[in-house]
Regions:
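Sec-dependent N-terminal signal peptides
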Residues: 4-14
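Kelch-like beta-propeller repeat domains
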Residues: 17-361
Length: 361
């Protein structure tokens, strides 16, 4: 764990508790993670088929390999831990022909048996770039890309290889559309592992996003930022109160204005909501508002290092990460937030473990 600095507004990034947590054995981004009973599990993304576990209850804390992922490696999936099993939903990976496609199979990992199992089920809507959380023993998911549009684009890219004019047309046709025409998923679905059944919880009152951050705490959902379309982020943030499979939504003030972020880290720290990091294209929002729908064309991706806290129903900047970072895993741990891995501005994955905690001084 890197040794960082005290930040203003009673926030601390450092090693006082996490000092014994070693770096991840491999650079890690676009993967999934979860925590149960002090044991942290991570896998997929840049780890390929590898999965690792670390038991933070032990005096000697070290990452150990667990059973390998048994099928197509993937990115932009989600993982939830329910009753001693890790459930992995969706994501994108290369099929047997080498074309990137959305993955529809569902796998569970039995922690006690160190064994993966393919489940006889499929999500009723496409899940990749979505968010998931646990409610009453069910895995709830929303957001993500449209399967037909997403798969169609990468199929066309593959077919156009070697023909630069056709490749340019494929990209122009795909990126030069308004956000609504990507049909991102705004259905809310719930999976019950005990029955191996899916349930329809309706739709969000806002357009679907991809790469949003999610927090579920005290029966309250927070969906923060994300992509409105490829290359264009959202500043919108929402909260929903979940009761008896019904959700009452309210919009929060915008966060990370004016561009928004996707792939940011989010968690509860000492009862407060935090959002950190994330990636965006500076200038894309202005270009889009001027009718340039391929809004990130010619722009460089930027990586935020800002840390925001939701204070009295408004977002306040309360500090900064040591460098811009996005697309890792964030988990609640010991009253703070762990940031596991991520991607920095050169596009490379990192092995860092960062701990954010309130400064009690």
């Amino acid at each position: 764990v890197k040794n960082f600095i005290y930040l203003p507004f009673c926030l601390f990034i450092g090693t006082s508790v996490a000092g014994a947590l070693p770096e991840i054995p491999e650079p890690f981004k676009y993967g999934v993670g979860g925590i149960e009973n002090g044991k942290i599990y991570i896998g997929l993304g840049s780890l390929g088929n590898n999965w690792y576990m670390i038991d933070t209850n032990q005096s000697e804390k070290k990452w150990t390999k667990i059973a390998q992922w048994p099928t197509v490696p993937r990115e932009q999936a989600t993982a939830t831990i329910i009753d001693g099993k890790i459930y992995v939903f969706g994501g994108i990976g290369k099929d047997k022909s080498g074309v990137i496609t959305l993955q529809k199979d569902v796998y569970s990992y039995d922690i006690a048996k160190d064994k993966w199992e393919k489940l006889m089920t499929r999500p009723p809507v496409s899940l990749a770039g979505h968010v998931s959380f646990i409610h009453n023993g069910h895995a709830v998911s929303t957001g993500g890309v449209n399967e037909n549009i997403f798969n169609g684009y990468f199929s066309d890219v593959e077919l156009s290889k070697g023909n630069s004019a056709l490749t340019e047309k494929v990209n122009r046709d795909y990126f030069s559309k308004p956000a609504d025409d990507y049909f991102l998923n705004n259905h809310i679905i719930s999976y019950d592992p005990s029955k191996n059944q899916w349930k329809n919880l309706g739709t969000t009152p806002f357009p679907g996003t991809a790469g949003s951050s999610v927090i579920f705490a005290e029966q309250q959902i927070y969906i923060l930022g994300g992509e409105r379309k490829p290359g264009l982020r959202s500043v919108r943030s929402w909260t929903g109160e979940l009761s008896h499979d019904r959700i009452k939504w309210s919009e929060l003030p915008p966060v990370a204005s004016p561009e928004g972020v996707s792939g940011a880290y989010a968690s509860v720290i000492d009862g407060n909501i935090f959002l950190a990091g994330g990636a965006y294209f500076p200038g894309a929002a202005e270009k889009y508002s001027n009718g340039e729908y391929w809004s990130h064309k010619g722009l460089d991706k930027a990586y935020s290092k800002e840390i925001y806290q939701l204070i009295k129903n408004d977002w306040k900047k309360v500090g900064s990460l040591p460098e811009g970072l996005a697309y890792g895993v964030s988990l609640p741990w010991q009253g703070g937030m762990l940031i596991l891995g991520g991607e920095k501005k050169d596009g490379k994955a990192v092995s860092d473990v960062i701990y954010l905690k309130k400064n009690d001084k």
